[in-house]
Each structure stands twice: as C-alpha cells, then as structure tokens.
C-alpha cells in the first residue's frame, strides 16, 4: 500500500503520516526524550515501549498448548505394512530422521524366540520423537541375527550431541562390528569392550576432517540364549522390572560421579560447573563415542552388567530425554500395565513429552516370557 502524506500548513501544525505503529512510537519516543522534564515520566514511557515491543514479537499467546502428536500406525493397522519375519535382521532405526513431519512419533516392534537352556519368547517395541528440540539427534537399532549358529537380539539407543552423525555411525556400525568379533559368542563381555573401543577409534579417524565436534551415548542390551547383557556409555539408560520393582541395569556416566571425576583428573582433565558439571566445561557426560577434542578424558569404555532373563519381566532402554522427566520407578509402573511392548514404548514417549521433556525422546521396551 502506498504511503500518503499531508503536508502541514504551518510549522506548529501536526504532521499526519499513515505509518506503522512502531514508527509512530519511535518518533514519540524521541519527542518525549527531548521534551520531558521529569525522570519518572521517562521511566514510565520506557517501560511502556519495552512492553509494546515484547508483545509484538512474542509467539501467539492465545494457543500455549503444544501441537498434537502425529502418530504412525500401530502394528496390524489397516494401512500399516505387514510385520517383518523374525528370522531376518530387523532394522527399524531411521524412520524418524526421514519423516516429512519432524514432530511425528514413530513406533513399531516384533516378537521372536531365542533358544538357550530355556526357550525365551520376547516381544519388543520402539518409539521415537523429536519433541521440542530443533533437530533430531537420537538414533536406535533393533536386530535379531544368527551369529555362528546362535540367535542374538540387539537393542540400542544412541543419543547424539553436537549433531546426529555420531549416533548414526553407531547405528550403522556398532552391531556389525560386534558380530564380526571372533569371541562375541564365547566371551561376549570381552568382545563388547574391545569393539566399543575399536568403533570409537574408527569413527574418530573418519571424523578427522570435520571442523565441528560431535559425540553420542550408547545404551545397549543383548539377548544371547537366556542371558541379558547390558553395556552402556553415557547417560542413556537401561532399567528392568523384577517382581514389579525398578532395577537399574546401567549407571549414568556423569562428571560428578566421584569415580568418573577421579578418572578424568588422573588423565589430566578437569570438570567445572557450567549450568551442570561438565568435562572441560563443555560436555555433561563423562563417557561417549566421538568428542575428539575431549579425548582421553571422555572415553567409550562401557560398563557391563549381566542378568538371567528368567528373573526379569521387561526392560526399558531409553535416551535421557525420557529419564530427565521420568524416574525409573515411574517408567516401570507405566509399562507394567501395558502388555503390548510397542504400545508401552509409545506411552512412555508421550508421557515424557507431556511432562515437559525438552529433548529428543527415544525408547525401546522388551518383554520376556521364559518357558
């Protein structure tokens, strides 16, 4: 629209301009500044001006509630694809990255068997949501594979920081490297430690030309026969239910853990408070893959725990986007009342979002039946 101007007939007449309210306020401000005789009047006008600009630039205040979640179809819905055969590797790990709707919540799962001393039937479900973060940095992996004649199930959640590329690398390479290790079946714990270190070293070589530092946590669970082996690096977490009680199967790697702080200082590093305790004032976890500028203080050596599956009802593997707002006890209580693993995983993610999680949220639920 063209601006029109009415020229004043004398110097003392007002000039009327069809201008934006902000222009008028700015002119009024300078007029008032040079003509006001009292400091108190100036302060009142200044506060009014600040309030006006705050109101103009604030988001829509009439609709403070978050947008509704877009939900992928449940397994078995009319429009969903048929389930994959449990005899082939199941990889459901990057749907949330490729979605056209960045706010969509994705979920899925399956059912399978493992033969050990006792037959283990398990069902698993996964769910992932970008949530309130600007970008999605979580990846996850579910695999069921035959390794040297032994069926192995793998579940992993990888929470990236400084970008998603480390988490994506782990999704693509960690399990592949593990099952390639000669002693993976015969000495699983030893193989896990060696492969985690190997994968971290190979990633750092690949990262050599990257100007920006990036890293990722890893919370992993392996089902081999009737054994559950958990290995974690960072603050993604694995929690089990035993007789209805929450049992942590991993311990978060935080810089303020006394043993972690001692290890970092012994290696020549330091931790300082910057909103939370951080390694070198930068990273809020004390172990991670990647983070080349913080080696050797931030390591990818996992802590490992083994359990007999027959003593457990289910496990939850999740990124800290869930654990920041849900306690272990709360998560177990929610899953306990939901028999379907996929529905339980979806419920956990939705509950984390509803409770105000500001991070990406990804979780996997695995239910056990031992006969």
From Swiss-Prot:
Extract the Pfam families matched here.
Answer: PP2C
PROSITE patterns in the record, alphabetically?
A: PPM_1, PPM_2
Task: Give one GO molecular function term.
Answer: metal ion binding
Q: Which cofactor does it need?
A: Mg(2+); Mn(2+)
GO CC annotation: membrane
Could you tell me where this protein is found in the cell?
Membrane
Q: Where are the transmembrane segments?
A: 29-49
Which SUPFAM superfamilies is this protein grouped with?
A: PP2C-like
> Any keyword Manganese?
yes
The name this protein carries in UniProt is Probable protein phosphatase 2C 11
């Amino acid at each position: 629209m063209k601006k029109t101007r009415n020229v004043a007939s004398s110097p003392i007449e007002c000039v009327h301009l069809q201008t934006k309210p902000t222009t008028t306020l700015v002119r009024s401000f300078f007029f008032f500044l040079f003509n006001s005789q009292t400091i108190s009047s100036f302060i009142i006008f200044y506060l009014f001006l600040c309030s006006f600009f705050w109101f103009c630039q604030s988001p829509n205040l009439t609709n403070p509630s978050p947008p509704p979640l877009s939900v992928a179809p449940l397994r078995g819905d009319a429009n969903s694809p048929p389930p994959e055969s449990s005899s082939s590797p199941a990889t459901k790990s990057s749907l949330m990255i490729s979605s056209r709707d960045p706010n969509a919540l994705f979920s899925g799962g399956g059912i399978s068997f493992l033969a050990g001393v006792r037959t283990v039937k398990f069902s698993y479900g996964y769910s992932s949501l970008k949530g309130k973060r600007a970008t999605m940095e979580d990846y996850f992996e579910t695999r069921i594979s035959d390794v040297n004649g032994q069926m192995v199930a793998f579940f992993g959640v990888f929470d990236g920081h400084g970008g998603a590329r480390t988490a994506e690398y782990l999704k693509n390479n960690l399990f592949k490297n593990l099952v390639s290790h000669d002693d993976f079946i015969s000495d699983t714990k030893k193989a896990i430690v060696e492969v985690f270190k190997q994968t971290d070293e190979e990633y750092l070589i690949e990262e050599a030309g990257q100007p920006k530092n990036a890293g990722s946590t890893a919370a992993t669970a392996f089902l081999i026969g009737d054994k559950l082996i958990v290995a974690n690096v960072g603050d993604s977490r694995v929690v089990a239910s035993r007789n209805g009680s929450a049992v942590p199967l991993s311990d978060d790697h935080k810089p303020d853990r006394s043993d972690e702080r001692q290890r970092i200082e012994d290696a020549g590093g330091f931790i300082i408070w910057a909103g939370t305790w951080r390694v070198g004032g930068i990273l809020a976890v004390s172990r991670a893959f990647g983070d080349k500028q913080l080696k050797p203080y931030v390591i990818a050596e996992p802590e490992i725990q083994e359990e007999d599956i027959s003593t457990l009802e289910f496990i939850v593997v999740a990124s800290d986007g869930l654990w920041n707002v849900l306690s272990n006890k709360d998560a177990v209580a929610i899953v306990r009342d939901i028999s379907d693993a996929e529905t339980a995983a979806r419920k956990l993610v939705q509950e984390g979002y509803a409770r105000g999680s500001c991070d990406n949220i990804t979780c996997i639920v695995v239910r056990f039946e031992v006969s």
